[in-house]
């Protein structure tokens, strides 16, 4: 029997280009009609506009309310739906035979039989099977044939109904060098210590001005890091990594919180390396901090619930997530497409946005990886990374697109760079013929700088070589409007015209191909990312990891903006300790305020470094902000000094 996407402890593989189309098994109620299923109802914040205005005040240096954060109880009393509103929803759903439990201040867990769910939300649920492929086991899930409709009597209080579709939906944002180039790799020591591909958090600290904080005794002590993830991991890997680096850590520093039963046992196919990276990097940058790992199944329901769990608990001062999907991911199935300014019809992005607003009001700092698909993030969902076909040499999507949740205005998005230095590659097995790639300055991570190497290796184009569209996720959101902290900043851009995607591609192998839709042109959207660190696998890091296939190993050559998110998480813990235990909240206004003041880059003691070279296959680095790399890279100790002056 195949594992089910609704069963607890069943590790599900994350989707990629190799995932087969699902087989429609027919109506769910005919397959397992007596087995209850669950959905999460995300409750709307009744005074969302007031909450967003408060977040702006709390996050803006110089505002009288700057950093006057609310406690959990204060937030609930002021902004959460009332008990009367919740009772009305519970009563309304009880009319359909559904059971309701309040799982947080703003979420409800609804359980019932498939037929009752269908009646409540006006859908027909089908069961689907994804066959095994390669070393990846098959699994089943359920999904509606049409979009759900929220019952009229409760619709005003509901932001989202999430979980009627239980398939794995999100991708880890770790990246490894393409196989053709990895085989050609030859190691040369980097200028700052370890060789490229073998860097550690100690090298990160040297490159980005963290060491001065360590010399002051700052380690993140007294702080709690939160990791939000959709795959489990092996904690001993992280402890082995920290021990190898000589870091002194508390043996009881990690606490695991299983959300919705947890994601199942660790496995390569489910993305366990991602969680391993998150814990090793954040906990290595802040070795004195405690770590809470909130891990949920890789479903829409798990995605929303992992945010709700971490934010409602309010135990971690700083959080990060390194999973995502392209911004319009939920419009690919069962369109019609909705107005981009109002969010998706099922409300996943709206539900998470309201949770992120709450996090900022409570003083929690939240980071997201900006993506590894350059300016074309949709390729992670539309299948760019499948086998190269000479008959379809341009099978990748050229739709400019950004990753979610990095595109949300209430989160800090981490982009990626390539470190300066020389990279050596072998052009034959004996390595008697070599090719050197010289990167004279730290630059935007975009693998087009390797096109000469690809030509030398005989690859006919960047897709065949495996380098397109690898690079720092960045661009312009067409779902989230430009936030106040980006208004007036040079380099902020509007969305480009002529961007098309194909909607309604269907779930199952015999579904019809859908229509083409134009994304909004010249839309004044939120620009992504905000800040960057090294993320190029070719100037990347080692990971201590227990593979479900090959066992424990020390794996070199890893990168992706998945490293940047947890590194920022660790940095935030250091900053909190440096600032005498203060919470930092949403960091975007302080960061952008530096650029708007003109003091961000002007002297050796400046908090930001210009990344004026390179591109992410469309957007170029420049002096100041760019949608390729954000504001540049951070000098952490210098930024800490500036933050101290704002308290």
Regions found by a protein language model. Name each.
Residues 556-568:
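Active-site-proximal helix/loop microenvironment
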Residues 576-629, 647:
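An often Trp-containing, charged/polar helix-loop segment at the C-terminal end
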Residues 569-577:
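Short glycine/serine- and small hydrophobic-enriched flexible loop segments
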Residues 618-622, 634-639:
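Basic/polar, cationic surfaces and motifs that engage anionic cell-wall
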Residues 2-7:
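Sec/Tat signal peptide C-region and signal peptidase I cleavage site
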Residues 8-104, 109, 114-369, 373-375, ...:
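Substrate-binding/charge-relay-adjacent region of secreted/lumenal peptidase catalytic domains
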């Amino acid at each position: 029997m195949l594992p089910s996407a609704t069963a607890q402890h069943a590790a599900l593989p994350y989707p990629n280009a190799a995932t087969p189309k699902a087989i429609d098994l027919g109506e769910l109620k005919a397959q397992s009609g007596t087995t209850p299923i669950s959905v999460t109802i995300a409750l709307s914040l009744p005074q969302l506009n007031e909450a967003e205005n408060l977040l702006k005040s709390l996050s803006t240096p110089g505002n009288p309310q700057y950093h006057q954060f609310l406690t959990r109880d204060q937030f609930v009393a002021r902004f959460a739906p009332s008990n009367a509103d919740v009772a009305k929803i519970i009563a309304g759903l009880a009319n359909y035979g559904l059971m309701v439990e309040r799982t947080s201040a703003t979420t409800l867990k609804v359980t019932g039989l498939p037929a009752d769910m269908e009646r409540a939300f006006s859908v027909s649920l089908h069961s689907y099977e994804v066959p095994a492929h390669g070393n990846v086991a098959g699994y089943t899930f359920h999904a509606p044939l049409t979009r759900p409709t929220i019952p009229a009597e409760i619709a005003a209080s509901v932001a989202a109904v999430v979980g009627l579709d239980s398939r794995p939906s999100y991708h880890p944002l770790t990246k490894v060098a393409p196989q053709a180039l990895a085989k050609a790799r030859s190691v040369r020591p980097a200028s700052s210590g370890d060789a490229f591909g073998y860097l550690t958090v100690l090298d990160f600290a040297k490159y980005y001005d963290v060491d001065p904080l360590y010399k002051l005794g700052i380690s993140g002590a007294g702080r709690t890091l939160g990791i939000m993830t959709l795959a489990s991991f092996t904690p001993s890997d992280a402890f082995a990594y920290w021990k190898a680096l000589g870091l002194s850590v508390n043996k009881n520093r990690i606490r695991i919180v299983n959300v919705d039963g947890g994601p199942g046992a660790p496995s390569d196919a489910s993305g366990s390396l991602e969680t391993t990276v998150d814990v090793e990097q954040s906990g290595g940058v802040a070795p004195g901090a405690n770590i809470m790992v909130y891990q949920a199944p890789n479903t829409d329901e798990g995605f929303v619930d992992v945010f709700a769990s971490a934010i409602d608990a309010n135990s971690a001062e700083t959080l990060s997530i390194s999973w995502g999907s392209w911004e319009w991911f939920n419009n690919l199935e069962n369109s019609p497409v909705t107005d981009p300014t109002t969010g998706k019809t099922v409300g996943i992005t709206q539900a998470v946005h309201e949770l992120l607003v709450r996090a900022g009001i409570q003083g929690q700092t939240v980071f997201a990886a900006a993506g590894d698909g350059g300016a074309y993030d949709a390729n992670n969902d539309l299948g760019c990374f499948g086998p190269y076909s000479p008959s379809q040499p341009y099978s990748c999507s050229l739709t400019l697109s950004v990753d979610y949740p990095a595109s949300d205005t209430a989160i800090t998005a981490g982009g990626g760079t390539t470190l300066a230095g020389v990279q050596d590659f072998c052009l034959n097995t004996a390595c008697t013929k070599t090719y050197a790639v010289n990167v004279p300055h730290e630059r935007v991570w975009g693998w087009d700088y390797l096109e000469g190497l690809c030509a030398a290796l005989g690859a006919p184009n960047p897709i065949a070589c495996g380098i397109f569209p690898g690079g720092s996720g960045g661009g312009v959101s067409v779902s989230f409007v430009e936030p106040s902290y980006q208004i007036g900043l040079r380099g902020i851009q509007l969305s480009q015209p002529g961007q098309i995607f194909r909607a309604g591609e269907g779930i199952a192998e015999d579904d019809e191909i859908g229509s083409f839709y134009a994304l909004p042109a010249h839309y004044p959207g939120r620009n992504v990312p905000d800040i960057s660190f090294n993320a190029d696998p070719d100037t990347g890091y080692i990971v201590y990891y227990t593979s479900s296939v090959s066992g424990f190993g020390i794996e070199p050559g890893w990168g992706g903006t998945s490293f940047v998110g947890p590194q920022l998480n660790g940095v935030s813990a250091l900053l909190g300790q440096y600032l005498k235990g203060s919470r930092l909240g949403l960091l975007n206004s302080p960061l952008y305020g530096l650029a708007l003041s003109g003091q961000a880059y002007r002297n050796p003691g400046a908090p930001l470094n210009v990344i004026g070279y390179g591109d992410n296959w469309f957007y170029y680095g420049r002096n100041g902000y760019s949608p390729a790399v954000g504001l540049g890279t951070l000098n952490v100790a210098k930024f800490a000094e500036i933050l101290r002056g704002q308290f």
